[in-house]
Amino acid sequence: MNLFCSLTTISYLCTITNIIHPMTKKLLLGLTALLTATTMSAQPKLRADNIDEVLKAMTLEEKAKLLVGGANNFFSTGAVVGGEAKLVPGAAGTTAEIARLGIPATVLTDGPAGVRIDPIRKGSNQTYYATAFPIGSCLASTWNTDLVAKVGEAIGKETKEYRCDVILGPGMNLHRNPLCGRNFEYYSEDPLLTGKIAAAYIHGVQSQGAGVSAKHFAVNSQETLRTSVDERVSQRAARELYLRGFEIAVRESNPWTIMASYNQVNGTYSMGNHDLLTSILRDDWGYKGMVMTDWIGIREGLTTASEVHAGNDLMEPGQPAQVNEIVAAVKNGTLDIADVDRNVRRMLEYIVKTPSFHKYPASNKPDFAAHAAITRQSATEGIVLLKNNGALPWKDNSIKTVALFGENSYDFLSGGTGSGCVHPPYVVDMVKGLQNAGINSSKTLSEIYTKYIDFAKVKFQAERHPAKWYQMEMFGQQKYPEIGISPICINNEVKTADAAIVTIGRQAGEGVDRDIATEFNLIPEEQALIKDVCNAFHAAGKPVIVIINSGSVIETASWSGYPDAILCAWQPGEEGGNSIADLLTGKVNPSAKLTMTWPIAATDHPSTQNFPGNIDFYSFQEAKGNKAALPGYDYTNHDEDIYVGYRYFDSFNKNVAYPFGYGLSYTTFEYSKPAVKVNGDLITVNITIKNTGKVAGKEIAQVYVAAPAGNIEKPSHELKGFAKTRELKPGESETLTIQMQKRDLASFDEANSQWMTEAGQYAFQIGASSRDIRATVNAKLTEYTEKVSNVLAPKHKLNILTASKK
């Protein structure tokens, strides 16, 4: 009889006091105390060096409990933002505590643009705001991994100071299509840039003793029906594009955790996809960390036992029924206890790294001033100058008063919606940003727009459009429709203002994709506003600047000819207005570059034909008798295959509004002395950058590689490396060194399930964008191959786009 059984028996005997002699009762109680003390002393307490001992001491029920989240408050339909209340109000979730073995609960908080927790708590006079850092698209546009790491460090510090252990980010899905509602959280259409920026972010966070959860693994390319849609993709496109960024991050930064996505990949849910979570992630890449589900609980068509077997270590947000299911599956033989033990070991290895395990004394008082400075710097370096006809920068106090048009000049969008939104202590809008730079703005326009915004907020609350109210009001800032401004009003502003700014805002986020007519394109009121303001101010010889305050790409080709300058400010965090003013006044020279192609029209992307919103749901279902699977909703075919973003536009010679890697500066740069050296598998590219202009600035050198014709069709060229100079003074030069491995140039050979770099002459193109190549050097490479798991093949035929279909 074990100690637990002995204690249970003695406790039972002690309850039947009517039949036990008093002396016997005292003896039994003493024995109970002795056995309790013995049992407690025999139980191991978790340490970093006794994980196997603790695992052996755990009961099956405790093991199952540790694999299931803390069952926090969340909407029963799943697929929403979590709502932890017990430890850190507003955090997304927790892991289970097992006190007898010294296993603490850990706290998971949403991100990745800052710590997402409730700013107000019942019974507390303190506020718990968090710094709103620039969104992913803005951060990546810096192309500055050192700066991104600093942002990560600040986020890691706030994560710890608010008693959290893991921030649920970075978001690493590709910008397959500009209509995806969650693109603002993600970095790029290119996997190399995605992986490098993510690795820097992860290094920064984890250097502070907090963890990350790189998400959403994998092929989460749309928000529409994201919890069920089947993303059908070739093995090659999956390996080269949708998985490659994760692979880079895993190999270079070793994230504590990875979050499996809601969607299916080739017919199997990612959360229960052994091909993804074990064969590729662990066997091919060597990942040793913990994998968690996205927030959904029990779902139809996927058992918790199958998730455990596939390699999912933590089911979030957690439901008691999932614990019971794991226990039952082990007992009835449908789940191997070895799978459970393997996952529990990974959970324990994660827990011993956390601030909660180390009893970190959280202050609830982050260094907001220091983090605001980092936010301002990273936003300023991530804002892209798209056009400049000599209107910027404003010099010598030439601009004293500005007419600010557009409702988002006054209701500035610092970030997106959903789990990616943050509750900051403040947001610097355009009015405040200009004021801090010593520039006045129109009081008349301020009164018009602030009164309109107050009205629009009341109207929005009254109407409560179901999808948008949930998305915006509960989990982010609403974007209100633009209003018309009369020509009389505009002409009155011309009389008193030295320049005009028109801010065009767009909001998007979790759970909803964007439409073309009103969210990608400008609505008629916005088109008219830009045209009327430009005509009026230009007639008086005064400049007009357009500020794009959007997390995602918008249409520009139809109106970009009107303004004198265009700045893509993205959603740059709480310091946005200050960052924009720094650029307008020339305090900082723009150095950002686009991380995605800006097409002339949304339909120019080949993926748009297989993207939700391009299909009339009701007409399709009626024609098919409500029985057929709906393309773009029930499934999405990645027929464009490897031709995503610039890989398509450059290979097929399609016109674009702004190419990948594009961004202007107030100075000019010369590229010289290009060189490439091959030493075994290591390839080193050198380029010297000289500032040939009149002001200091930074430049980003991008290395694209064009492969020789071979057995595997490839895009015309692909980004394989990049580097950013320090700030160069006029006339100053810097030689950049960019290294890559021969494997980095490989394509995925599906027939042989291997990576292959074919032998031949490779062109290393060094440029300022994918369409502005400044120097080219060639090198001959020998063949390279690497076998990997033959998994993740599509179950349905895809109509793959090839060069022969140009």
Regions from the PLM with identified roles:
Residues 1-45:
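Bacterial Sec-dependent N-terminal signal peptides
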Residues 30, 499-500, 779:
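Small side chains
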Residues 42-747, 756-766, 770, 792, ...:
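Glycoside hydrolase catalytic-domain context in secreted enzymes
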Residues 753:
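Extracellular/periplasmic metallocenter environments
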Residues 772-788:
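Short beta-strand elements
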